[in-house]
């Protein structure tokens, strides 16, 4: 039997539940990272469906069948992901048939769809449990009906394991799962205090509000801005507002941080808003953006790259460049390019920050080794289309006082235009910009380093050394350095 997504009525009860079964040896063996669970849970939650259980099972018919049978009796909906395809280890259809005591039979519509798609060797996909239903949703990318349907058996929906396909199918068939009786409300709070220190307050809050809301506490050891994320979750708005007031009155004063988790995604909006604010920092931002916009007018994106070594200055520059490109080209066709000159013995934390930054900003890394002159030569040889490099240089940096915003390389050097948007910025400007916009930066700066090089020539800045409440020596974060002239005291 076939149906359109709209033909099945959405959930109408207050409680609609779901269980998710992820199928695949590759997940259990660590060969493939599971991203489907996150997407399924988040989407179902937005549809008013409470996900109660997630199970990961191997490509074994009996194991899958047992889990499907159990889940189907316990939850309103069961969604499986994976194990659908033409090969020997694609056994989900067979397992679901076994779970309900049915036979596998060829389905005429699936046979026709496979023939239309020209799927040679995919005949196995037409063999489904005898009571299978077919659901033809609308592809959110094209607006056209899917050419191959989603198969369901009773309350079990069999999704493909390929993340891109799974997302498109669920987006196109949301109506199958929509629970109009419930809308979950969520609020995230960010606390700059240790989880242990606020645990009694959180316990009191949960006891006070009881079943009216759920209060989750999640420590984060890598954030530059908070130590704990709190998630308030309820079917009603009122308990969230009441709990927010309750926590605000009891948490340590100033510990709630107005953190913006989507600082990179919304960089264009936030950076330009700051530039137009008229503040002292805003004027510096406006000047830097003007330099970057001039560069974007003179060069194609493929001719530009950002010099990036993970330091605070180039992190600020990258965020500015990303914001300007985001504003000028809302749909950038390819990743932004960065030049990374690998040092002989980099900090592991710096290497990790580089990898995180590549993902956050969707970057293409042009890697080189040696000193700056050697690196530029290697860059020119490997990427002859490049003509200009944006640098995070400030006038207070060594040998930089005579530079201009657009400075060609010196005679005898590989020919590039050096673009210096931050030339007139100060150490304080850099930190005000990063911290005000919640831009992620290397965690070493929170441990007392103020200028980063390699492990051989970089130490914590003695100007930031102090004693903890327990009398142990610790280092304050780099943004608290009072005398900017002591910035490079980290370097040996």
Curated annotation (Swiss-Prot):
Its main location: cytoplasm. Its EC number is 2.7.7.2. The keyword Methyltransferase does not apply. Coiled coil: none annotated. It comes from the Eukaryota. The modification N6-succinyllysine is found at residue 283. Residues 303-460 are annotated as: FAD synthase. It is found in: Cytoplasm. It is an enzyme of class 2 (transferase). Residues 19-110 are annotated as: Molybdenum cofactor biosynthesis protein-like. One of its GO terms (molecular function) is identical protein binding. Pathway: Cofactor biosynthesis; FAD biosynthesis; FAD from FMN: step 1/1. InterPro entries: FAD_synth_MoaB/Mog-bd, FLAD1_M, MoaB/Mog-like_dom_sf, MoaB/Mog_dom, PAPS_reduct_dom, Rossmann-like_a/b/a_fold. It catalyses: FMN + ATP + H(+) = FAD + diphosphate. In the N-terminal section; belongs to the MoaB/Mog family. This is FAD synthase. It comes from Mus musculus (Mouse). The lineage of its organism: Eukaryota, Metazoa, Chordata, Craniata, Vertebrata.
